[in-house]
Each structure stands twice: as structure tokens, then as C-alpha cells.
Design a protein with these regions (language model features):
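HINT superfamily self-processing domains
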Residues: 546-549, 553-562, 566-567, 578, ...
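Conserved N-terminal architectural modules of multi-subunit, DNA-dependent RNA polymerase core subunits
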Residues: 1-540, 546-749
């Protein structure tokens, strides 16, 4: 029962009971509603959603990105008129997928079900087709002034097969839900979310990557001799499916007499470019304007040291003062080699290549030149602040800065790569057909590409074999990109039912598992609630392979256009001609997916408005909205790969859920989806937050934390955990009492590091110096026998337990924790329960420490060496034999024998045993 404050009174009928301090069923009612009727879909939801988004959206966008393909032959080029006599334009459209089929040897075609694919070692895959529109432009005449256009369409051209994820939208099992499981051969409790490749079940592990469109500042002085600080960003636009373009802004380690100059490293440019040269290439010419774009307010007293640090860059770039000179300088380092063209054309093409880099490769997530200019200034500003320790360097291991690439994204990257190869091969083949094709005998231009030569031009095996190989081997790496993506696809673990579900929720960091870096393996505080803290392998994969918590959701791509429309009334765009750098300073910047759009004069109103739209479901409920008041930024993200999790909303120190809602949940009147938006209630009950939103929230672990026990309480909680157990993954959540130690762990007591341990060789060694593999003499607490044991584990660590110093009458001192057990006359007793001067403890007969004092009062000799010799002389023993016994007794520390010898009690027992009946 939770105590919720109503009208300043505590209602003790809700989710938490203070008197008993125990949860009852209500938190589980909410969790049960999450899984109810959808428990299988929920557990592999991230896999299915990602794949469905790939086949329904990403794959179509990727194909459209290549339109149109322009093909010309150099043999048809007229250098006088600078035209081609024949041009071919090819566009792809109407992408379609078909049900998986089996083509039998007798010519029969039938529907393929997953079970048959398993049994017959088939690949469960769907055929893909596209329509190809071909446009020929034919120019004739002396000056090629006459042009004729011929259009042709080739329909349903096969481009390969795409492996199908079980239970996805295009899976047969999903389309034929009414068919009984006995007919399909499937288990009704199978969650899906995996592939069948050559009869083997394969699941794809989510791959961690650095979040795109975010600026990261690092100190690289230790590992780099050229630069001391760097700010880096990987940019991708919202509207296109392209590979990220990385831009680095770096501070040189070399002092040019005026300080350390700043350089920019751009894609497809061989050498780093001075910062001010890049600004001038973008149209900002004077040094003062450039400094204003970086610092915004150059007269601010806090910016004096930052302004001085730019002096080296000003001097470094004073040779190139115009936009034309700056672009020409950048062009000289462009990775472009003119082929089969004169010098003048080559220079022109190389200049166009550079302009394309500035337009499309430099910050492609920025939509206008103005946004690029301000973003370059923002990036430099962040770098300078980090260098002078005004802000902290970024944390590579924080989950705020990470994204998870799921099956859909990984397959789309492969598909884009192989479709690009298919298009390149197509261009080469069409060129050959134009130059040497059979159409030349009849000048039938329409038949340059026809159904006869089409499958030589478009090779369907390119995409099919590429995707199949990646899923079969687990190697998702792309050759020309040095990406470490081995072991991405794995054979599904079928050891137990729950292990197969857990395998589908696994996440891996694409790094060398044998590497000795510690930070990537540690449990980062930002992954609380998103990744299971317990479920990770032992050995070299520890911390590299992780598992999602059981309520974690991974976002997929969603349209960001509505976000741009919603924030427009609240912001002043950077393109506004009246906006100056001084106006931007001290105003709140507004970012959407890393793109700096403008500033807001009323940021709180914008923040609250966006939050309300999220609660109402007007914008995507998985959208991240953060007001960073320290950096004066509002950051809005709806990109794919963010980890999100549900938490209960708290408003005015009240959880927005009551008994009526709980009753409706239990009765089935309300389902989980009703709790996510305010369509069914005045307020949404549950909010999905990502690690960045979580870092700006105050989340109560239990509802009782929210109760206002005193009017002086200053904590203002924003959210509350549904239940603390939701931090665990599927496997760890099945462990009973996970907050308790396992029983063997409770028996691990501690001794002081200086305590001596007896080795099997008779040598005594400090316990701190014991190594794994050493053989020690151990004592079994039940059989009461000693044995030689090999050390397998060794721990040295601080303890919070009480530490006791035990001194015995014999002079032995032992330092041990309160729970360390000793053998006493009444059995095994912990140190804390020993009673001084009363309890008798058993210690190994060999002294580990010399006797320091005599607790018996007067020290007296019981048997001296002379007494021993004289006694045996009287018995007529030979002197040689007597001296042999003397030597042995001395070795045993029994001669001379004093009344404080710790072996007297043993001698007494032996003596009593001899004299007894």
C-alpha cells in the first residue's frame, strides 16, 4: 500500500504500508499489466520492432537514396559540344517482398514454414523485387541539338532474398495466426525474434556504438604527440540513411609563438585545415566575426582567456583572407583524382567536389550554412571550455553517450553496402552493353537493357549472399570500413527456455575481449535500470557482454518533422537576420537530435509544452526532452537505439496512481497502454525515460520515500520506480532474494593480512603473500581432520566488519573479523561470541608467534636437560642413545620443559591415556 498525500492527509490505503514496511500486490499489478497477454512480444519486442522498421521503412528509404542512377559512356562524349550522345537514367521503385517458398525438385512450389526450414536445412527467407524505370536520352544532329527520350519499365525484378525474423510482420506465423501450432510445428511459447539460416537458429546481439550528432571533448595528450585536446562528432542527417561523417576539431600540441593553433579534420580531406580557414570557406571572413561565432560575447570577462587562446589560430590563417582563397586551399587537399579529362575540367570538378564536402559531408545533420557556421563555433567553444577545465571532459562509457544498434539497423547497414555494390556492378555492365551490345546492329536503344541481359546486369546473389553470410558467420563487418563486428549473430541458446529469451536480449560492446581496458567493463551508474547489474559472463567477456533489464525498451527511428513544427513558435531560428551572436549569448539553445535550430527566450514554457505533448501522446512517448540549465540547452532526441524504461510519474509529491486505477488494472478494464498517455486519465501515469532524462530526474526507489514526513523536506521527486526489481534482466529476476548474499559468500570470513599460514612444506607464510596454486594445510570443520589443499581464490580487500585482536595464554595473537569461527571446547564459535578468560580455543600446536609473557605467575622448569640425562643414565641407557632423544625433544621444543609450554596439555592427555584403564 502506498501512502499518497491527499488534502495534506496521508491515505494509508494505497501502495505502501508504513506500519509493516512491506510491499503488497499493487506494484506487481502494474508489472503484470505490462506483460499480460503480450509477455512473449514484450521480451523480444526490441528485436521485432527493429526488424519491422527495417523491412517497412528503412529498406525503402535506402533504395530511394540511390535514385536516379546516371550512366554515360565516355565513348559517346562529344568534347566540342560537351555532351553525351546517349544518357541512361535508372530509378528503382515499388519494392516488394513475398512469402517464403520451397521449390521442390519436381517443380512443385509450396509455402515454407520455419519448422520445415529447420528440418531440411533451408534458409527462412523472402524474395525481394523492385520495378526498374529506365529513361534513355538520345541526342542527334551535328551539334547534338536534337534529343529524343525513351522510357521503359521492367517490373518485379528479383534482387535477392532477405532472411525473415520469426514472428515479425512478414513471417508466415504472424500472417497465419489462426493456424494451430500442431500444423506449423511451432511451440506456442516460442517468442521469435531470431532467424533460421541453413537450418540453424541465429539471434543477433545488439551492438553498442557512440551516439551520433553529439560533441565529445577528450584530452588526448597521453596518446598523441600532435594534438592535446580534441572535439569530435559523428554526424548523420535525420532524413537520409547514410553512414556517419566524422569531423574533429583539434588543438595542436605545437606552440607557434602565439599559442596552440586549432585545426579541423573533415571527411574526404587529406590534411587538417586551420579553423579560421574553414570559417572563411563557409562565408565568415573577418577575425572578429569568427571569434564572435565561437565565443558569442567576446567582451565577457570570463572569455578573456578563451579569446587569447584563439590568437594562435588567427595568425595561423592570416594567409587566406577571402572565401575563394580558403576554398582553393581546402581543394588542394581534397581526395579527388581527375581521370580522362583536361586540366581545366579537372580543376573545375575538384572544386565542385570540395563544395560538395562543405555542403554534404561537413555536419550533414545541419540543414543550412548558417547552422553549420554556428555549430562549428559551438564545437570549438566546447573544446576551449574543456581545455581550460571550465567543463568536464566527456565520458565515453556513459550510456547518455551510447546507442544500441539492433537487428534492423545492422541489417540496413549491410543492405546499403551490398545494394551500393549491386548498383556499381550494374553501371559497369550497362556501360559494356552501351559500347558492345547487340542493340547496335539495329540501333534499337530501347533494348540496351532487356529481360535477356537484365540478370547479368543486376546480380541477385550480391545482396542475398552478403546478408546470408553475415548471419551465418556472425561477421557484420564491412570491408572498406574497419569495423570490429565479429560474433554479432550467434546460434540461439536452447539450453533452457529462459536462456533463449535472455539470449535475445543480449547486448555486446564491439571491442577486443582480450583487451585490458577496465572502464568499459565496469558497471556505469547511467545504466541503472537499463542493463542487468548481475547478468554478465565470467572471464574475458565480463562487462563486454550485457543483458537488458526486463522492462527496458530500445527505441526505433521515428519521424522528427512534427518536433520541428511544434518548437517553431517558441524559438528564434539561427537564420533570423536580426539575430546576432551577442543576442544568442546567455540564451537557451534548442537542439533536436543534435541539430542546433535556434534559441528560446522562454525555455521553461517550451520545456513544459513539449513534456505535456509527450504525456498526451501527441509526440512520440519515447522522445527524450532534457532541460540542461547548466549548459543552457534544451535537448530533444527521438533517434533510434536509445535505452528507455518506464517509471511512475510524481507530481506535487504524489504518485499519479490510486486504488481505483489499481482495481481497474486488476479487473482488466485498464491495460498497460492506457497508463502511458493522458487519454484515459487526466494525467499519464507512466513515463518512459532514457539515461539522459534519468540524469536530470530524482527517482524514488520506493513509494514511501516520497511521503512528506516533515515540512522541511527539500527533496522534490519527479518519478518513482515501479519496483526496484525491474533493474534485473530475465535470468537475474528469477533468483529468489537477490538482495541477499548467496550462502557460501556469508561464510567468507577474514583474517589480518599479517596472519601466518602453514604450507604443506612446513613453511609459514603471511596470508597476504599466499598465491593461487599454493598448497596449504587446512582443517575440515566437520571431520576434524587436516589435509593439504590447493588455493583457488585469494581476496584482499577492506572490510566494514568489526575486527578483533585475540590473545591466548600461550602468547599467540590473531586478528580476525567478528564472524571468523574458532574451534573451542564447546564447538565452533564466532570471534564476537568468545568470552575472555573463559573460552578455550584450539590452535595448531606449532607456535606462530614467540611467547611474550607468562600468565601462570612464576616461571618454573618442570624438566631440565640435565635431569633428563641423569634419569636415563641411572637406567643404564647408552649415552649415544640418550643424546639422540635430547636432540629430538629440543627440536619439538619439549626440552627444557617449562610450566608455560603450550604442549603441556597435550602431554597431560597422553599421560592420562597411558595411565587410564
Amino acid at each position: 500500500m502506498v501512502n499518497i498525500i491527499k488534502n495534506n492527509k496521508i491515505d494509508k490505503s494505497n501502495m505502501y504500508n508504513i506500519e509493516t514496511e512491506q510491499y503488497i500486490e499493487e506494484p506487481w499489478s502494474i508489472i503484470e499489466s505490462y506483460f499480460k497477454g503480450h509477455h512473449l512480444e514484450r521480451l523480444v519486442r526490441h528485436q521485432l520492432e527493429s526488424y519491422n522498421n527495417f523491412v517497412g521503412y528503412q529498406i525503402i528509404k535506402t533504395i530511394e537514396m540511390f535514385n536516379p542512377v546516371h550512366i554515360v559512356s565516355e565513348n559517346d562524349y562529344d568534347p566540342v559540344n560537351k555532351k553525351h550522345s546517349l544518357e541512361v537514367f535508372i530509378t528503382f521503385e515499388n519494392f516488394q517482398m513475398y512469402r517464403p517458398q520451397i521449390h521442390e525438385n519436381n517443380g512443385a512450389i509450396k509455402l515454407m514454414f520455419p519448422q520445415e526450414a529447420r528440418l531440411r536445412n533451408f534458409t527462412y527467407a523472402s524474395a525481394m523485387t523492385i520495378d526498374i524505370n529506365i529513361k534513355y536520352i538520345i541526342r542527334t544532329g551535328v551539334n547534338l541539338e536534337n534529343s529524343q527520350t525513351i522510357c521503359k519499365t521492367l517490373s518485379k525484378i528479383h534482387i535477392g532474398k532477405l532472411p525473415i525474423m520469426l514472428k515479425s510482420n512478414i513471417c508466415v506465423l504472424n500472417q497465419y495466426k489462426y493456424v494451430e501450432h500442431t500444423h506449423t510445428g511451432e511451440c506456442k511459447y516460442d517468442a521469435g525474434g531470431y532467424f533460421i539460416i541453413n537450418g540453424s537458429e541465429k539471434t543477433v546481439l545488439g551492438q553498442e556504438r557512440t551516439a551520433e550528432n553529439r560533441v565529445y571533448c577528450f584530452n588526448v595528450a597521453k596518446n598523441n604527440t600532435k594534438y592535446i585536446w580534441t572535439a569530435e562528432i559523428k554526424s548523420v542527417p535525420d532524413t537520409k540513411c547514410i553512414s556517419p561523417k566524422q569531423t574533429n576539431v583539434m588543438i595542436s600540441s605545437k606552440n607557434n609563438g602565439f599559442g596552440n593553433a586549432i585545426y579541423v579534420q573533415m571527411p574526404r580531406i587529406k590534411q587538417v585545415i586551420p579553423l579560421f580557414v574553414v570559417f572563411r570557406a563557409l562565408g565568415v571572413l573577418t577575425d572578429k566575426e569568427i571569434c564572435e561565432k565561437i565565443l558569442l560575447d567576446i567582451n565577457h570577462p570570463h572569455h578573456k582567456i578563451l579569446l587569447q587562446s584563439l590568437q594562435a589560430s588567427v595568425i595561423d590563417s592570416n594567409i587566406y583572407l577571402t572565401q575563394e582563397e580558403s576554398i582553393k586551399y581546402i581543394t588542394s587537399f581534397a581526395m579527388y583524382t581527375p581521370i580522362n579529362m583536361d586540366r581545366e575540367t579537372g580543376i573545375k570538378k575538384k572544386l565542385e567536389f570540395t563544395m560538395d564536402i562543405l555542403k554534404n559531408d561537413l555536419f550533414p545533420h545541419c540543414q543550412t550554412i548558417t547552422q553549420k557556421i554556428y555549430f562549428l563555433g559551438y564545437m570549438t567553444n566546447r573544446l576551449l571550455h574543456a581545455r581550460f577545465e571550465l567543463i568536464k571532459p566527456d565520458d565515453r562509457d556513459s550510456y547518455i553517450n551510447k546507442r544500441i544498434d539492433l537487428t534492423g539497423t545492422l541489417l540496413n547497414n549491410l543492405f546499403r553496402n551490398y545494394f551500393n555494390k549491386l548498383v556499381k556492378d550494374m553501371e559497369k555492365q550497362v556501360n559494356r552493353e552501351i559500347n558492345n551490345g547487340s542493340w547496335k546492329s539495329t540501333d534499337d536503344y530501347e533494348n540496351i537493357i532487356n529481360l535477356t541481359n537484365l540478370y547479368k546486369i543486376i546480380k541477385s546473389t550480391t545482396i542475398e549472399n552478403g546478408l546470408k553470410r553475415a548471419l551465418a558467420t556472425g561477421d557484420f563487418g564491412i570491408k572498406h570500413i574497419n569495423s570490429n563486428k565479429v560474433g554479432v549473430a550467434q546460434v540461439l541458446n536452447r539450453l533452457t527456455y529462459i536462456s533463449s529469451l535472455s539470449h535475445a536480449r543480449r547486448v555486446s560492446t564491439p571491442t577486443d575481449k582480450s583487451g585490458k581496458l577496465i572502464p568499459p567493463r565496469k558497471l556505469h551508474n547511467t545504466c541503472w535500470g537499463y542493463l542487468c547489474p548481475a547478468e554478465t559472463p565470467e572471464g574475458q567477456s565480463v562487462g563486454i557482454v550485457k543483458n537488458l533489464s526486463y522492462m527496458t525498451h530500445v527505441t526505433i527511428h521515428s519521424n522528427s518533422q512534427p518536433l520541428y513544427e511544434y518548437i517553431t513558435p517558441y524559438i528564434i531560428k539561427l537564420e533570423n537576420p536580426e539575430l546576432t551572436s551577442i543576442n544568442i549569448f546567455n540564451k537557451v539553445k534548442v537542439f533536436i537530435n543534435g541539430t542546433w535550430l535556434g534559441i528560446s527566450e522562454d525555455p521553461y514554457e517550451l520545456f513544459i509544452s513539449l513534456k505535456e505533448k509527450k504525456y498526451k501522446g501527441i509526440i512520440n512517448i519515447y522522445t527524450s526532452i532534457v532541460f540542461d540549465y547548466k549548459m543552457k540547452e534544451i535537448r530533444i532526441c527521438n533517434d533510434s537505439g536509445r535505452l528507455t524504461r518506464p517509471v511512475l510519474r510524481v507530481k506535487n509529491k504524489n504518485i499519479l496512481i490510486d486504488n481505483d486505477m489499481i482495481s481497474k488494472i486488476n479487473s482488466g478494464e485498464i491495460i498497460w497502454d492506457n497508463l502511458l498517455t493522458s487519454t484515459s486519465f487526466p494525467e499519464s501515469i507512466i513515463e518512459y525515460i532514457d539515461p539522459e532524462e534519468q540524469s536530470w530526474s530524482l527517482i524514488a526507489t520506493k513509494p514511501k520515500d516520497i511521503i512528506n514526513y516533515s515540512s522541511e523536506q527539500i527533496l522534490k521527486y519527479t518519478h518513482c520506480e515501479i519496483h526496484p526489481s525491474s533493474i534485473f534482466g530475465i535470468l537475474a529476476s528469477c533468483i529468489p532474494f537477490p538482495e541477499h548474499n548467496q550462502s557460501p559468500r556469508n561464510t567468507y570470513q577474514c583474517l589480518d593480512i599479517n596472519e601466518l599460514v602453514l604450507l604443506s612444506s612446513g613453511e609459514k607464510k603471511r596470508i597476504a603473500d599466499i598465491n593461487i596454486g599454493d598448497e596449504v594445510i587446512s582443517f575440515h570443520p566437520e571431520t576434524m581432520e587436516t589435509s593439504i589443499t590447493k588455493v583457488t581464490h585469494h581476496y584482499i580487500r577492506e572490510t566494514i566488519k568489526k575486527i578483533y585482536n585475540i590473545k591466548t595464554i600461550s602468547g599467540r595473537e590473531i586478528i580476525a573479523t567478528e564472524d571468523h569461527k574458532f574451534m573451542t571446547s564447546s564447538g565452533w564459535v564466532e570471534v564476537k561470541d568468545l568470552i575472555p578468560t573463559i573460552t578455550k580455543i584450539g590452535i595448531y600446536m606449532n607456535n606462530c608467534y614467540p611467547i611474550k609473557n607468562n600468565s601462570f605467575g612464576t616461571l618454573s622448569c618442570i624438566l631440565s636437560e640435565d635431569q633428563f640425562i641423569n634419569f636415563f643414565k641411572e637406567q643404564n641407557f647408552k649415552m649415544k642413545l640418550i643424546m639422540k632423544y635430547v636432540s629430538e625433544l629440543k627440536n619439538q621444543e619439549l626440552l627444557p620443559l617449562y610450566n608455560n609450554n603450550n604442549k603441556i596439555s597435550i602431554l597431560s592427555r597422553i599421560f592420562g591415556f597411558i595411565l587410564s584403564d
